[in-house]
């Protein structure tokens, strides 16, 4: 098998020599090192954005249907030298077989590395990013921080063409919506349905109420897009001009003609501060769109005219934008005095864009310390370009900080973690999470692990037995949790401890689980970590039974999170009942055994019911085998010992007789339906009880009213 892999390597190295390299060696500059030459850019372009550079949601949307429909075709395209197909094949070999996606590529790190190298020689963005992550973490390649940070820098500057220097304030989704919540769909503010309702409300308010703020809000949604709502520049321009037209009536529908009309026929100044602010926002954004080429060809003169209108309304960002244009030498020669004066006025208003422009000016003058101060202020306000400049400043002197800023910049520009994936169907969303996780995005690693985590269902881990499918999913989840835990993510450390405690995806190792919980509690006080430590001390799992230490850890859990009050109260009661000094201890142990027997009976009852309902036997309930590649398209499958992850294999002896005796497991039952049915049954019972009590209360009130009427009569 080693000889086979060696021959395959030689084959692909030979093919690399004869492939046509698209684009050659990639050369890059910092964003806006030199002015944009309007004549060199086609109409509709945006800073000469390369068509090959896509955000991750766009890449997944375009490629996932092709992978599911005909993975062999994608493999053939990779053999022909297509860099995108080579990257996708490399990721499939890195991820291994996935029955949920219907993809059966074997896990083969050597082949994955070969395809990545082939794609990277053509400067394909995502291949370079994947190699950078592998070099930094020593995944299937020797660890090299210098090589990793060098590749991160190359990727960051390669995708800088997607950044709009003046108006690109991309939110840091990972910071605003941490995956510690474990379910992004609960983020109601980003619900697609809610966004649609807001858009309809704003339309009605803007058109019927002639409200300038509603027009600005609608234009913002159409300019930048939202989950489930694509960008529409024409509608954005329409609403920006509609907002301006409420004050400057009669202006044309063309941005260039509109600004000429405003300059030739000046109207009265806005009557309120809110109106002036809305007008200045519209003027500033129209200027940015003109400069960035979103209105056609990049037009610095038109942009300058709109920025001047914003300055006349005392808009600080418009002042910073004109200072930026003076600095870049767009419509006029560089004017140091004008730059200084405009920036001083904008900085006095604490304008984020002013800090970004001031940082760039300081960088050009060699004032690194002053530039760092200004750029960090801009970064704290969400300015995306400044993140790249800070990363460049730290490059070579502080690789740790440089890597952190490069990762942040790349993740936000390529949208490696974004709420847009909420609108994807479950399979596409799962593929996006796994692909982003392989590229090193922390939040996606946690979501990819959660997608395959068998411990997320209480019924699945308590009532139903574990089997090979459960352990296979657990190993995939454990792989991603391990990558996140290596970056000190608290919940991932706790999850790995759970897997070792329960023996999911690995043999049960309570002592190792205890060490993971202790590490999580030491890095950052976590109520869940303290709760797990208390539970292990209470039951003597991995450590001797110690009620005092259990109580101490339970108290720490309550101290760090008041939501643990009920759980801690029940734990204290449980310890009091199970204490050897209490005469309740024997009763408590008997109740525990009865409960366990009841769960086993429920387990066997459900399994037997499905056996009875399946006349062809339990094997007929198994999902179909995923489609495989044709023999002539796929290399030979490698030896599992050569490609297995550094994760312990499950100890089948510890699974018990349930693995061999129970033929049909929960993994082939619609788990969501079963859990939903159980919860619905509980809700119905509780609802009936409450309804009955309410009816009795109403009947009692009615009787009392009748008695009072009779007494008055």
From Swiss-Prot:
Entry's Gene Ontology cellular component terms? endoplasmic reticulum; Hrd1p ubiquitin ligase complex
Q: Which residues cross the membrane?
A: 671-691
SMART domains per record:
SEL1 (SM00671)
Write out the entry's keywords from A to Z. Endoplasmic reticulum, Glycoprotein, Membrane, Repeat, Signal, Transmembrane, Transmembrane helix
Attached carbohydrates are found at 48, 123, 211, 314
| Signal peptide (from-to) | 1-20
The highest taxon in the source lineage is: Eukaryota
Compartments where located: Endoplasmic reticulum membrane
Please give the biological process terms from Gene Ontology that the record holds.
Answer: ERAD pathway
InterPro entries per record: Sel1-like, Sel1_AlgK, TPR-like_helical_dom_sf
Query: Which Pfam families does the entry link to?
Result: Sel1
Point to the regions of Polar residues compositional bias.
Answer: 631-652
- PANTHER family xrefs: ERAD-ASSOCIATED E3 UBIQUITIN-PROTEIN LIGASE COMPONENT HRD3, SEL-1-LIKE PROTEIN
Q: Which family does it belong to?
A: Belongs to the sel-1 family.
Q: What does this protein do?
A: Component of the endoplasmic reticulum quality control (ERQC) system involved in ubiquitin-dependent degradation of missfolded endoplasmic reticulum proteins.
Q: Give the protein's recorded name.
A: Putative ERAD-associated E3 ubiquitin-protein ligase component
